[in-house]
């Protein structure tokens, strides 16, 4: 589920996710501190493409674009106030996964907590929420600082075939998802989750702050004339 957190200005990220019954690829760009644009490419595992599969091109796929705008970030108040964001999902493309939402996110640095609550329309149906807890973020052990335990209330009505397009994606035992996340070398995010009460999910993503980087190679002084 979405949160109101944003990346750094000029940041770009790539991601892969195995979230049964889909495989996800995504690209994320943060052109401004308050503006995030992302694209998603989904593979419907086990669902043949009616046009291309007979020619050996694999399963059915879907592409879409997402937009998120931060109206207020928690960093602006030094985490005294929550952040607020609105978003559109899959607003370009087939719109098979289209959703609209608003979300607030409160950061509690003292406890290593991030709490989000929001309301959505279409695929994200009504109230949703999420929590992330980093119990070791203030400790000296660099290997544990970025470990986070996460949970969320998933507001997607998977039983609705108009909103969940994959024929094997309708079954859900519980809307509560739990997982663990880990940031490696401050550039790579790994996550392992138990979703819908019946399936494991895995994701891997990497990001780089092109807007603030000093470059991959050192800048040499121009030679004197």
Segments the model singles out, each with a brief description of its role:
Residues 1-93, 100, 108-111, 140-143, ...:
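Transmembrane beta-barrel domains of Gram-negative outer membranes and organellar outer membranes
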Residues 88, 98-117, 127, 133-135:
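Internal active-site segments that recognize and position negatively charged phosphoryl groups
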Residues 116-148, 152-154, 158:
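A mid-sequence, solvent-exposed acidic-amphipathic segment
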Residues 97-99, 110-114, 122-126, 142-146, ...:
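Short gly/pro-enriched beta-turn/loop segments at secondary-structure junctions
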Residues 49-50, 126-129, 201-204:
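A short, polar/proline- and glycine-enriched secondary-structure boundary/capping micro-motif
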Residues 20-22, 60-64, 97, 124-126, ...:
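Membrane-spanning beta-strands of outer-membrane beta-barrel proteins
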Residues 130, 177-179:
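Short glycine-rich, acidic/polar surface loops and turns
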Residues 138-141, 148-150, 158-163, 168, ...:
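Flexible, glycine-rich linker and terminal segments associated
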């Amino acid at each position: 589920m979405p949160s109101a957190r944003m990346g750094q200005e000029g940041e770009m990220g790539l991601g892969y996710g195995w979230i049964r019954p889909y495989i996800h690829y995504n690209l994320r760009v943060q052109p401004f501190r308050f503006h995030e644009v992302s694209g998603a490419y989904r593979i419907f595992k086990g669902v043949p493409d009616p046009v291309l599969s007979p020619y050996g091109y694999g399963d059915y796929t879907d592409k879409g674009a997402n937009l998120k705008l931060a109206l207020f970030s928690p960093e602006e108040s030094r985490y005294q106030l929550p952040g607020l964001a609105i978003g559109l999902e899959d607003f370009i493309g087939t719109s098979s996964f289209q959703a609209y939402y608003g979300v607030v996110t409160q950061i509690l640095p003292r406890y290593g907590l991030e709490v989000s609550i929001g309301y959505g329309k279409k695929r994200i149906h009504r109230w949703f929420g999420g929590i992330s807890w980093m119990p070791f973020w203030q400790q000296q052990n660099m290997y544990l600082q970025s470990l986070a335990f996460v949970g969320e209330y998933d507001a997607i009505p998977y039983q609705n075939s108009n909103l969940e397009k994959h024929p094997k994606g309708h079954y859900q035992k519980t809307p509560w998802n739990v997982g663990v996340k880990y940031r490696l070398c401050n550039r790579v995010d790994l996550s392992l989750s138990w979703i819908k009460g019946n399936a494991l999910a895995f994701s891997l993503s990497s990001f780089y702050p092109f807007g603030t980087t000093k470059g991959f190679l050192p800048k040499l002084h121009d030679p004197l004339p």
